[in-house]
Amino acid sequence: PTAAPPEETKPVQPAAAAKKETPAQPLEAQENASEKKIGINLASRILTLYEGDTKVKMYHVGVGKTSTPTPTGYYAVQYKEVNPTWVDPDDTSVQIGPGPSNPIGYRWIGFSGNYGIHGTNHPESIGGYVSNGCVRMNEADVEDLYQYVSVGTPVTVYYDRLVIDVDPDHTVSYYVYPDGYGWQSLSVAQVKKALAGYGVEDFAEFQDISDKINASDGNVTYVAKAYDLVVNGNKLAKRALGKNGQIYLPSVAVATALKLDLQWN
């Protein structure tokens, strides 16, 4: 059988060949010129790199075990390190330098005390609740992420089982993830309310949503395409919806905006 991977901890000192990047001034005084930021959803176990509000990269990650969950909150990258040395959290005299035996891989992106984003020599653990609270990434992924972020890059860690996406073609879709930490119950009414914010709640049937919550498999559910409606220069609160090649208009809202007498035949 394969031995369990050693538990990670922040390297207390860099290896001889390590390259370390630390802030030259307080984090609040630094400007993030690229406007890049990191979002980590513990429920989906996905790390997203944003530029402004645009998603530019998404990576699967491993996060804290149920007994040692990754803390949620608002943070910032505090320091970065190439070729970190792993230090045994139970015996600091035990250390593993850079190389294939190092459980935190070849990159460390610290964002809060002992917590950081790092590589791993156990890629099979990615996607699970596996760590002492750090965020594990596949080595190729963390090396990719490392080049895009800098000290001061904002890091938001959160736990959302329901994720709603809007594609460039206006398609609204949602995902329901399992409650790995047991932190967040989810009801049909909550999903409906969230979809209402995108104007597509009427195209999501009660039973379909209930089935998705019961499955909690993280698979995508496409709802409808949503388009803004402008009448006489005014954007309506209701939206035009597209489904199966058909466009549906909110007739009452359009008639009211046009000051027409709407009659049903």
Each predicted region: which residue ranges?
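Exported/periplasmic cell-wall-interacting domains
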Residues: K19-T22, P26, A33, P89-D217
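A structural motif detector for short, solvent-exposed N-terminal "entry" segments of globular domains
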Residues: A24-T66
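Extracytoplasmic
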Residues: A33-E35, L42-R45, V56-M58, T72-Y74, ...
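Long, compositionally biased stretches
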Residues: I38-R45, T66-P123, Y222
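Stable alpha-helical elements in mature extracytoplasmic
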Residues: A43, G73, D141-L145, S187, ...
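Short, charged beta-turn/beta-strand-edge "cap" motif at the junction between a beta-strand
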Residues: D53, N83, R161-I164
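Primary recognition of N-terminal secretory signal peptides and signal-anchoring hydrophobic helices
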Residues: D208-N265
